[in-house]
Amino acid sequence: MNIEAAPVREVQTDSSVAIDDIELDKVLLQLGRRLQADGYRFVTVTPLTHQRNNARAGNQTAHDVRDVFGWSRPFEPGLLPEAETAALLENAIISEQAGLLRSEVRWSSLNDSLFVHSAYPTVAHDSVFFGPDTYRFAQAIGKHLSHSRHRIENAIDIGCGSGAGAIVIALARREAQVQAVDINPAALRFTAVNAALAGVTNVSAWHSDVLQGTHGNFDLIVANPPYMQDPQARAYRDGGGELGSALSVRIVREALDRLTPGGSLVLYTGAPSVAGVDLFLAQVQPIVDAAAFEWTYEEMDPDVFGEELETPGYQQAERIAAVVLTVTRIPRPSI
C-alpha cells in the first residue's frame, strides 16, 4: 500500500496538526482511492436497520470489503491485503478485538462520491455521522441549486460532519469557494479527506461554532445540524433545547444576517410535533417572517426515527418529521 504521494488538503483548526494525524489522512485517502477504483459502493442505513442486518445469521463476521467498511463487521486478518492491513493497524484505522480486526471508519456512497465517516455503532462523543439524513440533505441542496439563479461565489456548510453538503455544492458550482465548518476535529479531518477523494479544490475545512469563526457574507448557507434530544449530550446527535431544536433555531438566527442579497439558507433538520404543533416551525416562523426574507418549508419525510418516541423526553411527541427550511434574502430593487 503506497502512501507517499497522497496529497491531502490542509485543515484549518484552532490547534496544530500533529504529524501522526497527517499520516492518518494519507492512509485514509489511499484507502478511499483503492475502494473507489475497485467499484466499492455502500448505502448507509438507519442504526436500527443496520442492527437488524448485522443480527441475521451469517452476518456476525465480514466476508468482503462491504461487510468491513460498510456494515462494520469484524473480520479475519487475511481478508484485506497484508500491507494494507499493516498500514491501517499502524494508524488505528482498524483495531484488533478478540483475535479479529474491525474498522473504526465506514465508507458510504453519495452519487458518484465516497465519504469516510465513523463506524457503526456511533457511540463516541466525537462520532462523525452519515446516514439517511445525509442523503435527504444532499437532495435538498441539489434541488435548491437546480432552481436558484443566484450566482454563488461564497458558500458554507455549518456543522459539516463528513463534508457531504460542502462537497455537493463544490461539485455543482466549481467557481464557488465553499467553507466546511464544525467544532469536531474529526469531522474536519474526514471532510478534508473526502474533498480530496472527490477531486474538489474549492473546499476548505475550518473550526467554527456555527458562524462565529467566519467572516463576511454568503450566497448560500447550508446546514444539517443534530436535532435529537440526547441524554448523553453527544455533539453529533444532541440539538439541545426543546426536543433537540435549539441548535437549528440558533443557526436560523445567526445565518440570516450573513446572507447576501439573493442569498439563501437551506436548513435540513428534524421537527418534533406535540399535539399537532410543529415545535421547530413555531420557533422559527417569527424570525423568518421578517420583511427582508421570503421562505418555504417542506416536509421531506413525515416520520423519521420513530423508535425515539419510546425514549425519555419524547413521551409527548407524536412524530419527528424531516424538514427543509429555505430562506432567501430579498434583493433590493435596482434604482
Model-identified regions with their sequence ranges:
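Conserved SAM/SAH cofactor-binding pocket of Class I
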Residues: 131-223, 229-233
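Class I SAM-dependent transferase core
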Residues: 99-146
